[in-house]
Amino acid sequence: MARAVGIDLGTTNSVVSVLEGGEPTVIANAEGGRTTPSVVAFAKNGEVLVGEIAKRQAVTNIDRTVRSVKREVGTNWSTTIDDKKYTPQEISARVLQKLKRDAESYLGEAVTDAVITVPAYFNDAQRQATKEAGEIAGLNVLRIINEPTAAALAYGLEKGKEDELILVFDLGGGTFDVSLLEVGKDEDGFSTIQVRATSGDNHLGGDDWDQRVVDHLLKKVSSAYGIDLSKDKIAMQRLRESAEQAKKELSTATSTGISLQYLSMSENGPVHLDETLTRAQFEQMTQDLLDRTKKPFHDVIRDADVKLADIHHVVLVGGSTRMPAVTGVVKELLGGKEPNKGVNPDEVVAIGAALQAGVLKGERKDVLLIDVTPLSLGIETKGGIMTKLIERNTAIPTKRSEVFTTADDNQPSVLIQVFQGERELARDNKPLGTFELTGIAPAPRGVPQVEVTFDIDANGIVHVNAKDRGTGKEQSMTISGGSALSKEDIERMVKDAEQHANEDKQRREEAEARNQAEGLVYQTEKFVADNSDKLPEDGKAEVQAAVAELKTALAGTDAAEIKAKSDAVAQASQKLGAAMYAAQAEGGAAGDAGAQAGPDFTKPSASDEDVVDAEVVDDEKDK
């Protein structure tokens, strides 16, 4: 049975985890890191770079490097590189492919199934796009689950008490969520984790804190040199990297230095930046971002109808929660209660996803997870009103139906427009899709009965059905938002991703063949040089000719030619080595003959023949 993994597909970093003997383990990537930067780069030679290696080359390849694409998931955003358009799903799929590859390398077997996490406040289009990214990467997405829910799953299973409330404060690289969950455990150790309420902001995260530092540095350069660097892509990339590093350093230090030499050129010469940024300055310039975390927190407490004193545990999730100001605001919101710092904020979500994967695959049978839909779902009715069929924070999966009628006499069809959100007017909410139910029998307005059914599956993805009770005609659709990919698009992208995987494998094999060939040249030349006086001339000439041909092949790019010439050098070297040892053996035999004739030679005595260098004794037999 193929293994299932849990994946935290993050804005800035991603993590993959797997159950080993029923317990979750975070898998280190090929570079040795436990988190993989969610960065994809397209090298000019056609190679696709993912993770740390893509992040490191961003300064010199900025136009061909994509980062923080999670913020664009579920939208019509795309980027064009080498005349090819890439969607957020395709870029995300590259990251997922790397995580899949690293997991397979660690496990030594194929990985086909995955549970992928998304921010709790992701809408339907964003969830659908994430699922599509998994499919493009060659994964069977068992479930899409909310990040705070996964974190609570990882944290809550360790708790022994019944009916505890856990608040998860999740501030990542690009998104923010607050969720309140109830964790119960019965006498048999079976855990039930139920989401009580969730809220958030899909465009609030560590990237925004970084941008404030970048803006601050741009002003400093402008006032010192009178130039605007915001259009200088390379300078902006260097500023972004320095801003991110400064943010991290200010989590432990009260001030940090930012030094960027030769950042750009001005009329008066090179532009250098040497700045000191204090934690107080940093917190002042980002205070409004911090304030934006407060409303979702209060919304969750209100929706769940609980008192702050009822909350047993507070879990911080996401690398951005390491900032002291964030920890401070959480403590302030909780009336002085200290958040729990016993979990790794970068890894806890992936660990929860791996646990859920284990539940779905039958590896863990001691937990039930009940999630909720983060936003209300409804349709537009007369007057542009948003008529809700499923309210936010409803447990999923769920199914709701309601009967509507026509607005005009003899109306032959109705247009079903589906929206997601909390506003009273449909136009102020997120449009998810539109479809038409036709063939309604002629009748006065108000007479036909059209039953509209909303069905939200365990992934939080919406399915809608409309049925005319009079004629029995019905129309269905799976809502997938404006960014949705057709089945043909997904299949094409899957093939494209597989092709790139094969190309990457071929490149690795070519690089290995080249490395082995270069090593073979070095070893062979060293062997010939070290043993020149002991080697036959004809054998030396053959090896040197083979090495020369291999060097010529290495100057080119034909991997098959390099391998063939390497084999020729190896064979010639083996022959030469055999000839050298044969010559030494002959010389040794002649020496033995001379020694036997000499006066000092004595035959071994009978006792000498019985001498052995060492003997293994089995003590057990003697006992």
From Swiss-Prot:
Pfam families: HSP70 (PF00012). This is Chaperone protein DnaK. It comes from Kineococcus radiotolerans (strain ATCC BAA-149 / DSM 14245 / SRS30216). Induction: By stress conditions e.g. heat shock. Belongs to the heat shock protein 70 family. The modification Phosphothreonine is found at residue 175. The keyword Nucleotide-binding applies. Residues 496-524, 583-623 are annotated as: Disordered. Residues 496-515 have a biased composition (Basic and acidic residues). Residues 583-598 have a biased composition (Low complexity). GO terms for molecular function: ATP binding; ATP-dependent protein folding chaperone; unfolded protein binding. Acts as a chaperone. InterPro entries: ATPase_NBD, Chaperone_DnaK, Heat_shock_70_CS, HSP70_C_sf, HSP70_peptide-bd_sf, Hsp_70_fam.
